[in-house]
């Protein structure tokens, strides 16, 4: 009997609370998102994907990070202006990673 250790990764999701439209991406190692430029780029990609579906200007948004291996998920309510601010966007992602990884260590 072999034991497989398949990493299902971490799912970063941007959700429009009013319509449930979403954009998402899986990362096998979320630590890459600790790099501010990478986090900012990924948030911008998710934002642009969601913008192609709906007008985000007056929408309530939620940024979520889920560990697909154990189901632990944390989210943060946000506004489009925060997501478009590189410092704020990278800080939000870092905070979500720290919380999810904290549960991983318990």
Protein language model annotation of sequence segments:
Residues 1, 33-54, 87-106:
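Charged, amphipathic alpha-helical segments
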